[in-house]
């Protein structure tokens, strides 16, 4: 399993994600939580967090939470759906990813996003194809 510095390194290898500042809150087998400061590069008109940024970060930690299991060396998104419940106008923003089910080649993941007032702002579900060593 990887740690917070590994997680930051994985984000740094991605053209978009490398612009995201975050701090790992915890990493466990099948679970990741990160805290993202609400900075200008994540805002859209109206001073709220851009929905595309919410989805990109959610998708990233969704897939990475599957990689916390032994033997999984990479993953790709098969499907990803997001429901936006309320705009995020206050940070920091907490992203919590949990693997609901994992098989030989597919993982099913849920990602919850909470705003700076700890209100549920979005819920995503993702399906990831797994590459094993």
UniProtKB/Swiss-Prot annotation:
Pfam families registered for this protein in UniProt: 4HBT
EC nos: 3.1.2.-
Hydrolase listed as a keyword: yes
GO terms, molecular function: hydrolase activity
InterPro entries: HotDog_dom_sf, PAAI_dom, Thioestr_dom
Keyword Hydrolase listed: yes
UniProt keywords, alphabetically: Hydrolase
Similarity comment text for this entry: Belongs to the thioesterase PaaI family.
Protein name as it appears in the record: Putative esterase TV1331
Organism listed in the record: Thermoplasma volcanium (strain ATCC 51530 / DSM 4299 / JCM 9571 / NBRC 15438 / GSS1)
Source taxonomy: Archaea, Methanobacteriati, Thermoplasmatota, Thermoplasmata, Thermoplasmatales
């Amino acid at each position: 399993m990887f740690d917070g510095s590994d997680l930051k390194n994985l984000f740094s290898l991605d053209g978009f994600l490398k612009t995201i500042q975050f701090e790992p809150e915890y990493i466990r087998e099948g679970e990741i939580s990160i805290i993202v400061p609400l900075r200008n590069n994540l805002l859209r008109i109206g001073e709220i967090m851009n929905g595309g940024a919410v989805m990109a970060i959610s998708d990233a930690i969704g897939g990475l939470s599957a990689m916390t299991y032994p033997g999984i060396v990479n993953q790709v998104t098969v499907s990803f759906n997001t429901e936006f419940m309320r705009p995020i106008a206050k940070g920091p923003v907490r992203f919590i990813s949990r693997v609901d089910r994992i098989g030989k080649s597919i993982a099913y993941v849920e990602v919850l996003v909470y705003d700076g007032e700890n209100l549920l702002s979005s819920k995503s579900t993702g399906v990831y194809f797994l590459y094993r060593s």
